[in-house]
UniProtKB/Swiss-Prot annotation:
InterPro entries referenced in this protein's UniProt entry, alphabetically: Methylgl_synth, Methylglyoxal_synth_AS, MGS-like_dom, MGS-like_dom_sf
Protein name, UniProt field: Methylglyoxal synthase
Source species of the chain: Pasteurella multocida (strain Pm70)
One GO process term, biological-process aspect: methylglyoxal biosynthetic process
Xref: PANTHER family: METHYLGLYOXAL SYNTHASE
Protein residues bound to substrate: 19, 23, 45-48, 65-66, 98
CDD domains assigned: MGS
Amino acid sequence: MQSTARTLSVNKHIALVAHDHCKQDLINWCKTHRTLLAQHTLYATGTTGNLIQKEANLPIKSLLSGPMGGDQQLGGLIAEKQIDVLIFFWDPMNAVPHDPDVKALMRIATVWNIPVAMNMATADFLITSPSFAQETQVRIPDYDGYLKERLK
C-alpha cells in the first residue's frame, strides 16, 4: 500500500489508557506532566479517564470503559485520524477479558503510525521530545489511493 503524509498539529489529541494494576501509575504520570498535558486534547477509556480527571484535575473526554468497548472506540478515532498519540500503561503480567480489543487497538495504532508509549519510560521520552511540542509529519496509509485501486 502506498503512503501519504499526515500532519500532527501542535495541539495533540492524546489517548490515555491503563489496565487496572497500572491506573495509579498513569495518574501519577499525568500529575507529573499536568502542565504539558493541559495544552492538549485528552481522551481516555471510561474508568481511567474519570480517575485522571478527578485526581490529576485534567479535562478528559471519557469514552466507554475498555471492556465495554472503549478500546474499540479509541481504535475508531485513530482510524479516523482524530487521535495523534496513544499512552497505554498495560499490565503484561495479567490477562484481561478484552485482550482481543487491546490487540486490535495496538494494531490500529501501528497501521496509522501514531506514536505509542506502553510504559512510563517511553511516555517520558515521548512527552519530552521536541516533536511533541511542535507540528510534525508522520507517514500513514494512503487509504484513498487504496480504495481507488480496489474499485477499478
